[in-house]
Amino acid sequence: MLLKQVVEAHAASNGSAGARSIAMMVTQAGIPLSRYRAGRRMKQLGLTSTQPPSHRYKKADQPHLAIPNLLDREFDVTVPNKTWAGDITYLWTGARWAYLAVVIDLFSRKPVGWALSLSPNTDLVKKALLMAYESRGEPKGVLFHSDQGCQYTSQGFRQLLWRYRMTQSLSRRGNCWDNAPTERFFRSLKTEWVPAIGYPSIATAKSSIIEYMVGYYSSLRPHKHNDGLPPNEIEKKYWNAQKAVARNT
């Protein structure tokens, strides 16, 4: 039974999970398993973690706007839909690069909006924000943080933030650590899931990335920020606690 759970956890991660992640996933499934025991079982089964090095997308900064870094690396957010962070990366799709924009809720580190396109333009980040806004029930007063990429400082994107009544925050120029959660998400995506040679087509890339974000990262993958729980589980825990409080008031 244990060996079967280890194999299933490894397969669910697309072969990327190491002993620590497999131990958390199997334990969450109801079978207590330590990291070291997971490592021994992986060795017994001939399972390894395949995580190639990442490659960062270079962005064009637009530092002329007087928009402060309101987030100021305060990444520990206690409420969903309070602070979102956006970023762009690129993926090889057979004959050319495709560009992925995501929106991450910093409470759970869950990707709540995304868009994939052959052009890293303003429409790309607007589509990702629109998806996040609609899928999260059109929340009010969200702080949206990003780097100073031209897509995020464009008039079109800033107007969309204004329409949604969101406040904009920008990283300092050239400082990737000001948006560390999205950088870490992209690193996880590329090292855990994306094939080393990329995808054969943009359609294949889209299907695979959705599977990662929805089926694995949000639902199954243990996250250190959430004390080992996947984003969906930590959000479920939060909302259940809110319902309990409401019943008792």
Predicted regions and their residues:
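Active-site beta-loop-alpha junctions of metal-dependent nucleic acid enzymes
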Residues: R96, A115-G137, L143, T153
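RNase H-like two-metal-ion nuclease catalytic core shared by retroviral integrases
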Residues: K58-Q62, S146-Q148, S154-R158, L170-K190, ...
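C-terminal domain-tail junction helix/linker
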Residues: W162-M166, S188-T249
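Short small-residue beta-strand/loop micro-motif enriched in glycine and branched aliphatics
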Residues: S108-W114, Q168-L170, P195-A196
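Conserved, non-catalytic sequence blocks in retroelement Pol enzymes and Pol-derived host proteins
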Residues: A12-G15, F75-V77, T93-G94, Q148, ...
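An active-site-proximal beta-strand-loop segment
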Residues: R73, V77-V112, L118-S119
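Mobile genetic element proteins and their domesticated derivatives, centered on retroelements
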Residues: V6, I22, A38, M42, ...
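Basic, flexible linker segments flanking DNA-binding modules
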Residues: M1-V79, N175, P230-A241
